[in-house]
Regions:
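Periplasmic OmpA-like peptidoglycan-binding domain that tethers envelope proteins to the cell wall
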Residues: 43-50, 72-151
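Periplasmic peptidoglycan-binding/tethering modules of Gram-negative envelope proteins
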Residues: 1-66, 140-151
Length: 151
């Protein structure tokens, strides 16, 4: 597992305690196998994932994070095609988060990962299904102190 990454079901985000002094300023939410995946060669976000995305939106807003959305694919198809498909997946998730009310300035990036970072084997149908996914990299916003007026 990557450093500063947390593997969770995004539906359980409300139960994540990030307020401890050891909480990372940057975390990657690697959604587990129950979470946001795509059908083969598709980039549409299914309605069954809307609650998950609403939880991510609330988590980002309530904990002062900015988000980068990373799209992934399985290994079927050319590398070039898979990079384009992974971008379309990330863009579709971005559009849905914006539709649910996340401020556009909270989304700081879209990353097309293609087939380069599988989380499961591409040798099986089940593994390929897990690799057709998005991940979310969250970076805590710097809080800038407000200047005080000296009178």
């Amino acid at each position: 597992m990557r450093e500063n990454s947390i593997r969770i079901n995004a539906l359980e985000l409300k139960n994540v305690d990030i307020l401890s002094s050891e909480a990372p300023k940057e975390i990657t939410i690697v959604l587990d196998e129950r979470s946001l995946n795509f059908d083969f060669d598709k980039s549409n976000v299914k309605p069954e994932y809307y609650d998950l995305l609403k939880n991510i939106k609330e988590f980002v807003e309530q904990n002062n994070y900015e988000i980068t959305i990373q799209g992934h694919t399985d290994s079927i198809g050319s590398n070039a095609y898979n990079f384009k498909l992974s971008r379309r997946r990330a863009e579709a998730v971005k559009a849905k988060l914006l539709e649910f009310g996340l401020s556009e300035d909270r989304i700081v990036g879209i990353e097309a990962m293609g087939e380069e970072q599988p989380i499961a084997t591409n040798a099986t149908k089940e593994g390929r299904a897990q690799n057709r996914r998005v991940e979310f990299k969250l970076v805590q916003r710097e809080t800038i102190p407000m200047p005080t007026e000296n009178k």
